[in-house]
Amino acid sequence: MNGGLGRIFKEHPDRRYIMFGGKGGLGKTTFSAAAAYYLAKQGQRVLVFSVDPQASLSDIFQQDIFGKGPVEIMPNLYAQEIDADKRIKAYQGEIRKKIFDMYGFDKIPDEIESYIQAAAAEPAMEESAIFDEVVDIVVAGKYDYYIYDLVPLGHALYYLSMASVYDEWIERITKLREDMRQYEEMAAAISKDKEVEEDMILKELQYIKHRISTSSSILTDRHKTAFFFVVIPEEMILIDTQKAAQLFAKFNVPLSGYVVNRVIPESLASLDIPEYLRNRLQMQKGYLKKIDELFGAEVLARVPEFERDITGLPMIEKMATALFGPIQ
């Protein structure tokens, strides 16, 4: 069963946006790096980027990439860890500039500056900053494949829902702005300069809406996007994954299949091994059977437990081979 993802990628060459989802610590980042390695070896220009504030791509590639934009790891393979703090500071600068441009203030009023500073400390601001950076990355369209190193399941659902929430919010604000303009025009109470300011605000809202729409349409496009759930042969993981799959379906995220990680080789059972390991193998056998019963043909690969951590390109290549088959 190893190497099953290679078949999916060959059968669906238009699926250029790749995501691995699952609970924390199951191997999502490792699989993301391995998929990027495989595709780069096929001559595709690939960007793997983390939307997790506690990103570990730097550790896996053994290279500091945090906050440095796309970093070339090897030919065709680029990796990026988004610096949310840097993005938030850029937000603040953009907000100040827009206030100057739209309202002609000589300086930002103290109460507005206080709000700008306070908003940066909001818990959701980090996720918002990362989301906006992802929109920039995707809209730019510089790569053949984009691989999202997602946060754990709960946060991933929040991230995936942000597009629809933002879209609805922008839609309402834009409608309100348009209504306000109509009332003001009917009252003939605005000057020429004011009309220009109103147009700038509407233009900005429409620009934001277009960016969000572009990103969200990719996430739910069955022809362009592949989403893989990562599971391991353990009871609670299977229960959580079933629940998560139902929730992801509500956001119309196209599920391409399941990948089973950390499978202890059954061949060990014929050796002189400790009793606890023999018990683990017996338990695993039952869970693997249950995985097959639950997910059937959607199980694309069983990845073995490796002898060491997956860090550095040689080990990433081993993982890529387990996922996709021989690397050419």
Give residue ranges: language-model regions.
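Short, hydrophobic/aromatic alpha-helical segments in well-folded domains
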Residues: 34-35, 133, 214, 244
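Electropositive phosphate-/nucleotide-binding environments in soluble metabolic enzymes
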Residues: 128, 209, 281, 285
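C-terminal-of-GTPase-core extension/linker across diverse P-loop GTPases
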Residues: 199-215, 237
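Nucleotide-state-sensitive switch-loop elements of NTP-binding domains
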Residues: 1-18, 23-26, 31, 37-202, ...
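C-terminal lobe/tail of nucleotide-utilizing enzymes
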Residues: 1-12, 214-328
